[in-house]
């Protein structure tokens, strides 16, 4: 099938709200010509994908052409909003408006431990309400969902149950395939393409609980500012982070770049954990394994184990606490970090993080 062909009458040219008449020929011609899409065209394309009307060839061409052109924040905003509109909704008011997500794009090519998952548990134990969005492994041996499942956490809960989990335990988990069933149309294409595309950005941008704060890891330094622009448009309080060693986390092996999003603005900063007393780690210190191996590491850290993994977990949990503090216009950068690091360390040392994980497991067992 030629890329400009339409597979059905339903895929014929349509006029997105407020935008130009659109077809795959027009969308792909603009992208392959190196031009940004007109307003509404990215939304049109994503709706075609989410409703199953786009062919695999059209999905692949769109993903690759958008990546080569380099997506803009405006385009990614449209893609993410359409995806959220197709997601399972939460009941109005079910999730409090100061929740935090801790998640990364993946795709850094390094099989690290599930640092964001551990950091989410620690941040929740420090008193920050967490609603984490995640999935099974794509490029690593064990994704956050795989590790949580191995720990005994239920990952198959729907919106009402996740909202209860956040309210009663302090943390909840939105399993991406359950909340985004329409996104399945991209799965085979993404696997077959085998290289990162704009779709890698969408997971952290489409938490169906719509948290207002987050520590968001981006493995692609050139696209981190695009993600930050999306969060700025939402007026979220977010730290978009890229380890200068390539990790989609705050790293302890070197410095990280942070795009601090607050009150609709974006500031780019270089962050050195050595300034807070963290010793330099080696990347090998942070490597993970399968779900069983990673779950054992979670238990060891939450039980009070010392070393580079704990350091990385405390650092990332503190980053989430800082992002949460940023929901207040009174938050100051260095004091917020000092507070976040102290609270994250105390959550482990007091046993609060270990106890929270046990409560989370029991919550799922009792449903």
From Swiss-Prot:
GO molecular function, one term: anthranilate phosphoribosyltransferase activity
Binding site for 5-phospho-alpha-D-ribose 1-diphosphate: 104, 107-108, 112, 114-117, 132-140, 144
Residues engaged in binding Mg(2+) 1: 116, 249
Ranges of biased composition (kind: Low complexity): 1-21
Cofactor(s) the record lists: Mg(2+)
Residues reported in the UniProt entry to bind anthranilate 1: 104, 135
Binding site for Mg(2+) 2: 248-249
Coiled-coil positions: none
Protein name per its UniProtKB record: Anthranilate phosphoribosyltransferase
Organism annotation: Mycolicibacterium paratuberculosis (strain ATCC BAA-968 / K-10)
């Amino acid at each position: 099938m030629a890329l400009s062909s339409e597979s059905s009458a339903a895929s014929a040219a349509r006029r997105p709200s407020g935008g130009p008449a659109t077809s795959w020929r027009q969308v792909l011609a603009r992208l392959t010509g190196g031009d940004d899409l007109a307003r509404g065209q990215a939304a049109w394309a994503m709706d075609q994908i989410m409703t199953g009307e786009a062919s695999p060839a059209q999905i692949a061409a769109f993903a690759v052409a958008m990546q080569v052109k380099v997506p803009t924040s405006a385009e990614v905003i449209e893609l993410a909003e359409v995806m959220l509109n197709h997601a399972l909704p939460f009941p109005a008011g079910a999730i409090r408006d100061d929740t935090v997500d801790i998640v990364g794009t993946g795709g850094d090519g390094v099989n690290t431990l599930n640092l964001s998952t551990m950091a989410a548990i620690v941040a929740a134990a420090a008193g920050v309400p967490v609603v984490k969005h995640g999935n099974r492994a794509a490029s690593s041996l064990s994704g956050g969902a795989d590790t949580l499942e191995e720990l005994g956490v239920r990952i198959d809960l729907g919106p009402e149950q996740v909202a209860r989990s956040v309210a009663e335990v302090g943390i909840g988990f939105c399993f991406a395939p359950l909340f985004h069933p329409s996104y399945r149309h991209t799965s085979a294409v993404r696997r077959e393409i085998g290289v990162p595309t704009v779709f890698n950005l969408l997971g952290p941008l489409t938490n169906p609980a719509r948290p207002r704060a987050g520590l968001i890891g981006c493995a692609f330094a050139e696209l981190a500012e695009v993600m930050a622009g999306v969060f700025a448009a939402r007026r979220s309080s977010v730290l978009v982070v890229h380890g200068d060693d390539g990790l989609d986390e705050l790293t302890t092996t070197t410095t990280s770049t942070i795009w601090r999003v607050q009150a609709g603005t974006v500031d780019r900063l270089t962050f050195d954990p050595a300034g807070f007393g963290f010793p330099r780690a080696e990347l090998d210190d942070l490597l993970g394994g399968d779900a069983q191996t990673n779950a054992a590491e979670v238990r060891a850290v939450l039980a009070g184990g010392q070393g580079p993994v704990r350091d990385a977990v405390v650092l990332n949990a503190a980053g989430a606490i800082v992002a949460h503090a940023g929901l207040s216009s009174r938050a100051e950068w260095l004091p917020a970090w000092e507070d976040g690091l102290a609270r994250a360390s105390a959550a482990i040392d007091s046993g609060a993080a270990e106890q929270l994980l046990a409560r989370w497991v029991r919550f799922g067992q009792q449903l």
